Amino acid sequence: MAKKVQAYVKLQVAAGMANPSPPVGPALGQQGVNIMEFCKAFNAKTDSIEKGLPIPVVITVYADRSFTFVTKTPPAAVLLKKAAGIKSGSGKPNKDKVGKISRAQLQEIAQTKAADMTGADIEAMTRSIEGTARSMGLVVED
């Protein structure tokens, strides 16, 4: 028989840098999960990813206090900022442009995000990423 699910915990944790301090500790501690066990497993799974990149993770906590987790790809905004070489997006994206990004870079980001996005094809996913870039104040160049 399948285990009974007690809770789902959604967090964004820096790749390879999970530790028991907030936000990981309190979120998992409330559910009675072994925090160090999660941190070791998460860090092992994300050691191939660039350290410090925020990785969304969905942790399924079962009634017997065991857990499983699924990692997602980094948020599109983080990948766009990294590709454009900027610290943060524009506060006024329609007026102040903060950087430029090429269509090839957008397609590369869409390929990275393809596993988590529900778009029909890579072109649709690229357009979605392009919209995110524009809302951050990035200029898309052909």
Curated annotation (Swiss-Prot):
Pfam families: Ribosomal_L11, Ribosomal_L11_N
An MF annotation (GO) of this entry: rRNA binding
Keywords for this protein: Methylation, Ribonucleoprotein, Ribosomal protein, RNA-binding, rRNA-binding
Tagged with keyword Membrane: no
Matching CDD domains: Ribosomal_L11
Residue numbers bearing the N6,N6,N6-trimethyllysine modification: K4, K40
Modified residue annotations for N6-succinyllysine: K72, K81
Matching SMART domains: RL11
Source organism superkingdom: Bacteria
InterPro entries given in the database record: Ribosomal_uL11 (IPR000911), Ribosomal_uL11_bac-typ (IPR006519), Ribosomal_uL11_C (IPR020783), Ribosomal_uL11_C_sf (IPR036769), Ribosomal_uL11_CS (IPR020785), Ribosomal_uL11_N (IPR020784), Ribosomal_uL11_N_sf (IPR036796)
GO biological process: cytoplasmic translation; ribosomal large subunit assembly; stringent response; translation; translational termination
Residues that bear N,N,N-trimethylalanine: A2
GO cellular component, one term: cytosol
Subunit structure, interactors included: Part of the ribosomal stalk of the 50S ribosomal subunit. Interacts with L10 and the large rRNA to form the base of the stalk. L10 forms an elongated spine to which 2 L12 dimers bind in a sequential fashion forming a pentameric L10(L12)2(L12)2 complex.
Function: Forms part of the ribosomal stalk which helps the ribosome interact with GTP-bound translation factors.
NCBIfam families: L11_bact
Family membership: Belongs to the universal ribosomal protein uL11 family.
UniProt name for this protein: Large ribosomal subunit protein uL11
